[in-house]
Amino acid sequence: AICAAPIALHQAGVLKDKRFTCYDGVQEQITDGIYQKETVVVDGNLTTSRGPSTALAFAYELVAQLGGDAESLRVGMLYRDVFGNQQ
């Protein structure tokens, strides 16, 4: 889930006791999860990201989870995390 989509996960009960991230301010509407202000957060089979500016980091994480070579993609596209987090 990316941007404000974790609200839907919250409403479905998916975020209970799970770490997540989302668009700034959205976390105030979510009471069950454990908010972390990071570019991408993975907790088990749940992957969340902060918003449109983090879409590439989110995509690279999904590629890695599916067994792809995310690092080669990062290098090839000269990717640099917009928030300065290590990915």
Identify the residue ranges that each predicted region occupies.
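Active-site-adjacent pocket-lining segments in enzyme domains
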Residues: A1-Q87
